[in-house]
C-alpha cells in the first residue's frame, strides 16, 4: 500500500482564533514557559481490515462453490478527513488458475458518491480479474500446479512478473482465456441508512462456466480472502508492480493470513487534535470538575474544537493568571487542527504555586478532549520550574455532552458532522475515559499527544 499523508483541512468545522497572550516580557518574579503540544499519533490510511473465510450458512472455513456466498460487514462514514473518500477493496482467488484473483481496481470501490450518499446494489461491473504475476500460468481448469490439483501450497514455476489485469474477452500473458467476470462472481453492496455496510460475494459459476482442454468444463470455486476499508489516497495493491506477499498468498493458494498481517499495522483511526485553550492559574482553581456537567467552553472544545468561549470565560475567573487560545500550528499561517507530526506552541508566565491546564479535542469523537487533571499541572517543584516531557500527566475525558458514536465513523463527529453542535445531547457529566469505558476503543493519550514544558531564560 502507498504511504498516506493525510490532509487535515478541518478549519471550517473547527474554529476559534482569539488569544490573550500579549507577548510582553514576564512580570517581575515570573518565569516564562514555552509549551508545545505535539500530535504524535500515527496516520492510518486503512480504517478497517480483515479476512473472510466461512461461507454463509457454513460452520467451517472453506471456498465457495456455485450457489455459495461470503458476507463481510463493517461500518464506515463518508470520510475520515475533509476531501477524502472511503473505499472498499477485497481479493479472492480464481481457484482454477495459478495466480489469478478478483478484486476492484487498485484504488477500490467508492462507498459513497460525490453527494455523500451510500452506494448500494450490484457492483460486479467494477470488478477486475488480475494476474498476480507470481506463477507461470497453465491452462485454466487443468494445470497441475493450480489449487484444486497442486500437491501443496506455493507450488508451480515462479514467474517473477508484475500485477496485470485481464479484461473480459482478453487473453492472459500466456494466451489463455477466462470466463467473463459476471459468469463467475457477483458482488452486491447493502447499507443500513446510517454507517453499516454488508458486502456479499456470490459464486454464480456453473459446471459449464470454464471450458477445459479435454473438451469438458468445470465450475470456478472462489477462495477465502482479505478486505480493507481505506481512504481514496491509498491503493490496495500496485498495478504494474510485483505483488505483495499477501496478494501472492491469496492469488496462488487462497490463503488470506499474510494479507491480514500486512494490513494490520496500517489499520486504525487517525486522530487530529483541535485548537484549544490553555491557562495558568492558582492551585485553588479547577479547569473543570470531573463528575460535574461540562461548562459551555469545555463543551465547545470537546464537540467542535472551538476554544473561543472557554478562553473568554476564563478572563473573569479569580485565580487565572493567563489564558490563551492556541489555534495556529507551528509553521502554518492560519488556524487549523494538527494532524500526526503537527504541533502547537505558546508561551505563558507563572510564579511558584501556579499550575498549567489545557484542553484540545480528540477530533475523531463526539465530545472527547485531552487535558491534564482538573486541578492542572504544577509548573514548579518548590521554587524550581518544571522542565521536559509531561505527557504522562495527560488524560482523555468525555465531556458527557453528546452521545458517543464509533470513533472515526460517527456521522455527528468532526469532520463528518453537518455543522457545529450537532448530535444527540447526552446530558451527562465529565468522566475520564480509560480503556473501553463507553464501549469503544481509543488510543492511549501518550500515543496521541506529547506535551513539553520548557522554562525560558533564567
Please identify what each model-predicted range represents.
Residues 18-21:
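Bacterial signal peptide processing site
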Residues 137-191, 404-458:
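Activation corresponds to long, low-complexity, non-globular regions
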